[in-house]
């Protein structure tokens, strides 16, 4: 049945770990409401598995071994790797979809070199989204990582090719598959600038992404992204891959820069997948 849903959302640890510290609880709750809507949209699509394209934070890979792309093919995944009290998410086991993941990996490998892992430890980059999108952790999950942490980073044109390859792989399957890309827009995690958000930059990027303006999307330069959107801005790769996989235009359902305690521009959007 192929890809039945594609969307994006933010994943900063403060979204769950510092929820009680948000000064504007009205905006916080509106953000949460749109995350709930995203969960319901995924459920309504009939998705049997969920691919999560994320940017992990040295939970599984470090500078001694940093693949550009990796897919989790294990029967189960564990998380969060961080302290549960800090993240406000209990440690749990998440079901995988190994047979489907292997089929997807074999297909993607015809276009993009792809590493794989049978043992995946989920950090906040996956656990925060899952805590909203499958709070009972009963939907099989296939994690995918794009290196957004340790330069040299994979080129954006290659990210687009990865997204297109993943879509082709999904369309070859009989299962109904949902896909979300999760990362920051502008954010400066673990720095003195933590909490800073470049709203103008975010909105410009999101407008280009929703309109599938491939030329502009692929014209971003890492050095400029770093200056305008922080080191967390490199995570636009997860969102770009999702847009490429979807193929259709997007709908920005929620964006706010008014929750600095979350230290990220809070975003929820979905794309037309052409079904």
Please place each PLM-identified region on the residue numbering.
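Short glycine-rich, polar/acidic loop-and-turn segments at beta strand-coil junctions
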Residues: 11-13, 54-59
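Beta-strand elements within well-structured catalytic alpha/beta cores of enzymes
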Residues: 48-54, 144, 175-183
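Short, internal active-site loops enriched in acidic
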Residues: 56-59, 183-187
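Non-transmembrane, aqueous-exposed alpha-helical and coiled segments at domain scale
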Residues: 164-171, 175-177
């Amino acid at each position: 049945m192929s890809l039945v849903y594609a969307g994006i959302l933010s994943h900063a640890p403060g979204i769950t770990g510092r929820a009680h510290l948000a000064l504007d609880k009205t905006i916080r709750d509106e953000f949460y409401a749109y995350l709930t809507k995203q969960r319901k949209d995924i459920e309504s699509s009939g998705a049997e598995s969920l691919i999560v394209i994320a940017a992990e934070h040295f939970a599984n890979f470090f500078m001694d071994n940093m693949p550009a792309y990796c897919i989790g093919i294990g029967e189960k995944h564990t998380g969060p790797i961080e302290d549960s009290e800090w993240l406000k998410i209990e440690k749990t086991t998440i079901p995988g979809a190994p047979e489907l993941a292997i089929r997807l990996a074999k297909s993607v490998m015809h276009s993009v070199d792809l590493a794989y892992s049978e043992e995946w430890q989920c950090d906040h980059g996956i656990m925060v989204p899952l805590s909203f999108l499958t709070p009972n952790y009963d939907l099989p999950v296939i994690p995918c990582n794009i290196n957004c942490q340790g330069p040299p980073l994979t080129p954006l044109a290659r990210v687009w090719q990865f997204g297109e390859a993943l879509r082709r792989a999904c369309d070859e399957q009989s299962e109904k598959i949902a896909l979300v890309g999760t990362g920051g827009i502008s954010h400066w995690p673990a720095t003195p600038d933590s909490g800073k958000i470049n709203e103008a930059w975010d909105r410009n990027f999101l407008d280009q992404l929703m309109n599938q303006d491939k030329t502009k999307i692929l014209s971003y330069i890492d050095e400029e992204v770093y200056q305008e959107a922080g080191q967390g801005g490199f995570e636009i790769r997860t969102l770009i891959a999702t847009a490429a996989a979807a193929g259709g235009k997007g709908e920005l359902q929620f964006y706010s820069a008014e929750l600095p305690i979350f230290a990220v521009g809070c975003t929820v959007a979905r794309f037309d997948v052409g079904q």
